[in-house]
């Protein structure tokens, strides 16, 4: 199959599923060759879906009921606060959230890094995650614990330090099989393909796949592209004005500790650029989860949760599990 990819021929869903399982038994050199060849060719919806389905089928199983996930693909090389972690905590004030995350590969603050910097403990086992969900409406699913078959592939990804199909796969391979999902991608071209792949993997009722002018988030300082899936596909663009928010700057972030501190500042009611960034993405997640009727409603719901102290209280609950 490597020659086929090098010749820029696309793989079918079935071939992609087979290739994923084959990579688990390949040498690191050949794994790197496949990953770079796929990335150079450009991945299709079928290839993403085939890999994602195989990744889910190889994962440690966990049943948390009907959950939402907020996750980005990473790989945008940005130095921003970890917005998806902030959003997941806000969202858990209203619905069950299974946050599928990992340590950083290309950014300054991966979700697992920031989660621990917030003083939260990553559940060791699926049973621990279930207890966390029962007590707090929130469970952090640390990807390496649920995808042990990828141990051989992770060192290759770390060594390559470039975007690969695995950056895309993480959000599609949540072992809790989320029914609702807001998923950030690292290029505009990916939004439709990832939305199609998500629908093919199965289990999704509603999803937003977002790209924000260089970020795998909705951006507060420009135009964002969204592909929405709710049984049908719709692609459109939004700006902060569609959320009732002013344009704001994206301030760089240099470490998980800094990210955690700035998240807590927002949760504590501080009004700054970070707040707009978080509110915009929280609104997207609340709309995706069918808690908010639209983005404007989502912003108001998120604001109230922060201003009433619900979000800080929720963070404290999660810390104390």
UniProtKB/Swiss-Prot annotation:
EC identifiers of the protein: 2.4.2.18
Sites where the protein binds Mg(2+) 1: 84, 217
Pfam hit, one: Glycos_trans_3N
Binding-site residues, anthranilate 2: 157
GO biological process, one term: L-tryptophan biosynthetic process
Cofactor(s) the protein requires to work: Mg(2+)
InterPro entries, sorted: Anthranilate_Pribosyl_Tfrase, Glycosyl_Trfase_fam3, Glycosyl_Trfase_fam3_N_dom, Glycosyl_Trfase_fam3_N_dom_sf, Nuc_phospho_transferase
Keyword tags: Amino-acid biosynthesis, Aromatic amino acid biosynthesis, Glycosyltransferase, Magnesium, Metal-binding, Transferase, Tryptophan biosynthesis
A cellular component term, taken from the record's GO annotations: cytosol
Pathway the protein acts in: Amino-acid biosynthesis; L-tryptophan biosynthesis; L-tryptophan from chorismate: step 2/5
The keyword RNA-binding is assigned to this record: no
Oligomeric and partner information: Homodimer.
Binding-site residues, 5-phospho-alpha-D-ribose 1-diphosphate: 72, 75-76, 80, 82-85, 99-107, 111
Top EC class of this enzyme: transferase
Annotated binding of Mg(2+) 2, by residue: 216-217
GO terms for MF: anthranilate phosphoribosyltransferase activity; magnesium ion binding
Protein name, per record: Anthranilate phosphoribosyltransferase
Binding site for anthranilate 1: 72, 102
Gene3D superfamilies cross-referenced by the UniProt entry: Nucleoside phosphorylase/phosphoribosyltransferase catalytic domain, Transferase, Pyrimidine Nucleoside Phosphorylase, Chain C
Role this protein plays: Catalyzes the transfer of the phosphoribosyl group of 5-phosphorylribose-1-pyrophosphate (PRPP) to anthranilate to yield N-(5'-phosphoribosyl)-anthranilate (PRA).
Manner of cofactor binding, per the entry note: Binds 2 magnesium ions per monomer.
Family to which this protein belongs: Belongs to the anthranilate phosphoribosyltransferase family.
Name of the encoding gene: trpD
Reaction(s) catalysed by this chain's protein: N-(5-phospho-beta-D-ribosyl)anthranilate + diphosphate = 5-phospho-alpha-D-ribose 1-diphosphate + anthranilate
